[in-house]
């Protein structure tokens, strides 16, 4: 949220927000708070955008959301298709990676369910969108409150770098991945680069720190 504000202050008209590598699972509440959304308990008092605070959440006040966002194109770069809630959602899939126990995962999913319910019918509907659960639910907040849209992260990078044009006349492409496994094939950079190269019949070599059996 603070980075988005800084970009707005700098006059940015197009924002690309990378989703991944987050240590949070708050449904984007922290970002939204920085952008002017208020999170309130049953008495109308502000609550913290932490699991403890969100446990008391009763309403959202979006009246203070930075109005400049209405004139800015927002894209979310994402390489996962997880929804916000449920067994494939932000809490269940990524919570354990961030240290959450099974009991905490259930609590986090309950909190995100409440958050989406309080956001209105649009927020409830967007909770099932692919990528809504990315970065602890930040994807959902971008879709719901910032009017953003999801884009494949690797597609955005390919466009920005002009990779497809650079492939013309290439004899080979070298790319890399920390761990080449089944997840690599679900939208990771190496898979996207390989797909772009395959369109032009250019062979690809992937360097990886580890190659799992399910990558073959």
Locate each region found by the language model.
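N-terminal loops that bind phosphate or other acidic moieties
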Residues: 1-19, 23-216
């Amino acid at each position: 949220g603070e980075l988005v504000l800084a970009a707005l202050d700098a006059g940015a008209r197009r924002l690309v927000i990378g989703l991944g590598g987050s240590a949070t699972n708050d449904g984007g509440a922290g970002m939204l708070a920085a952008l002017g959304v208020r999170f309130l308990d049953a008495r109308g008092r502000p609550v913290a955008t932490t699991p403890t605070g969100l446990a008391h959440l009763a309403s959202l006040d979006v009246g203070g959301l930075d109005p400049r966002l209405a004139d800015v194109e927002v894209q979310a770069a994402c390489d996962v298709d997880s929804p916000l809630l449920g067994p494939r959602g932000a809490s269940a899939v990524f919570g354990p990676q961030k240290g959450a126990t099974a009991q905490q995962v259930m609590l986090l999913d309950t909190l995100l369910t409440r958050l989406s319910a309080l956001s209105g019918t649009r927020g409830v509907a967007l909770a099932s969108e692919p990528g809504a659960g990315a970065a602890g639910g930040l994807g959902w907040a971008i879709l719901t409150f910032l009017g953003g849209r999801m884009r494949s992260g690797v597609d955005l990078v390919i466009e920005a770098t002009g990779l497809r044009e650079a492939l013309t006349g290439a004899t080979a492409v070298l790319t890399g991945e920390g761990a080449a496994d089944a997840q690599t094939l679900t939208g990771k950079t190496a898979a996207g680069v390989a797909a772009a190269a395959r369109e032009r019949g250019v062979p690809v070599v992937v360097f990886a720190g580890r190659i799992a059996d399910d990558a073959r």
